[in-house]
Amino acid sequence: MSSSLQELCRKKLPDCILPEFFDDYVLQLLGLHWQDHGSLQRIEKNQILVQQEPIHINEALKVAASEGNYEIVELLLSWEADPRYAVVGALESKYYDLVHKYYGQVKDCHDILPLIQNPETFEKCHELNSTCSLKCLFKHAVMNDMLPILEKYTDYLDRWEYCSQMLFELACRKKKYEMVVWIEGVLGVGKVTSLFTIAISNRDLQLYSLGFSIILEKLYSCGQDPTFLLNHFLRDVSIKGLLPFVLKTIEYGGSKEIAITLAKKYQHKHILKYFETWES
């Protein structure tokens, strides 16, 4: 069959119901047969049928690339599959010629990283950009919840205080709470209180509460009184009129009287009303 006729069939037939008399041999001639999987048919923009079973086109592309099946990869890309999945699949199975063939359609490895679950593949993907540093890898590991990457480089990070602090604050801003706990607990950071600044600025009550869980445990284990620290942050959130943060600080031991005094001074009526209702 001529290549032009095959291309025409590949473009037109997938949107139609395939005739029953199309056996594997005919489908192979048409380029619509996937070895070890079966017939291929495009049914929607993002969906195909593989041996009459529906599958997302990008998932199919990832599998085809992991098998090193250039023909099927090309077919699925012509059906508007996302080339990032071709790179991921090829990386997982170490088809590096295929990786470099399709990476050019993506250009930035950082656009691929969110699709990857395996830490080894994640690091390989990041290495596709030869200009990126380890610090860049660590930042994207935090943003994509790839804790095993940080665990692998624990000894390296343990000697790099600046980077640990930067990653800690990034995890706080991106609401990666598991990362926040791990970085502080394993690597240690010089300025834990930066967490509270970020939490208050971003109105992130969960991070704010997590910060107290972390820092109070440290203070109590050292036999230190946390009252000064609690009231320091209580003043900050009271001045800003952040009632949920005020209540959370009081819950951990902050002074209700300080909150009421500052609410009166800065005329935060919603805070005063809350405490009036509470007391009544």
From Swiss-Prot:
Induction data: Expressed in the early phase of the viral replicative cycle.
Transmembrane portions of the chain: none
Source organism superkingdom: Viruses
UniProtKB keywords: Early protein
InterPro entries referenced in this protein's UniProt entry, alphabetically: MGF_505
UniProt xrefs under Pfam families: DUF249 (PF03158)
Function of the molecule: Plays a role in virus cell tropism, and may be required for efficient virus replication in macrophages.
Family: Belongs to the asfivirus MGF 505 family.
Name of the protein in question: Protein MGF 505-3R
